[in-house]
Amino acid sequence: MSLKYTCPSCGTPLGYEGLCWKCKCEQERQAALAWMPEQIVEKQRNLIQNIQRLADMEDPEFADFWQLLGYHDAITPEIQRVALAAEVFWPCEIYYHAPADVRDGLIHALLSAEYSSAASNLMSCLAMQGDDKAMETLLELGRNPRPWRKGLYVDPSSYAQIGGWTFDKEGQRIRLGFDTCYPMVKGTTGEKSPVRIGIGRAREDTCPHCGGRMVDILVLDGRDERLKFLGLDGILTATCCPSCVGFLKGPAFNRFTLDGGVEVFPSELFDGAEKTDCYVSPEEYKALTENPFVLGKTPVPLFYGAAC
């Protein structure tokens, strides 16, 4: 059955009149990116005055928070202090890199917590704050669990991962991410980019399970100046079967060489079968080869992808 409407921006068939969700998100993103400084200040002020509405997921405060954080990196210590005073501990991202006095308030609340639900939220907040004292607190709680630990599924070190880091049993910090972020943006036909995601670059080899074409799903050239922060002096290529990758018993492992070469390791289907059907159509393979996204020219805030 054909749908009655189409998106006026991209032509996607729809069951309703108006923009599709992708174009709607893009429209909202561009509007938020165009905020003037005085608009940002006004939205910060409104968030401070109505901080409880953020916890209740009420708009405009909820949408404003994510756009202030994701597009402008504009969650101020004042907002964080007001959130702490009001005991607003969700979303935890509000405490990202909060100042020491806010961190101490979070630690006090965590050490005073009686229930696992409250402790879970507070450890997430402390993970977002993320300094050495925050780590020391989570490490101590891992070594000497409180009664509420019985109501949680994972240790404090797993909560630290929410903030982009963790630690081992000896208390050594382990970074899980980078402090630099570039977006993938729509490029033009044939435009070169040091990063390609889902490009479906043509390969001669086929999948041993379904017989479908293998694809280079990610190609990343670490020699590009924008990607120097990765410390990769060469080209990373990741290859998989787009049909079977979701049906494997474990991860789809590769070994790459810095000249762009890749070796695909043997894999096993989740049900132990030797063969299966290929569920990727020729049209879908073609769409992979026409992916238009390229690496953006300038860095963006770390939470850029969370704002939409």
Placement of each model-derived feature along the sequence:
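Preference for intrinsically disordered or flexible, low-complexity segments
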Residues: L3-C308
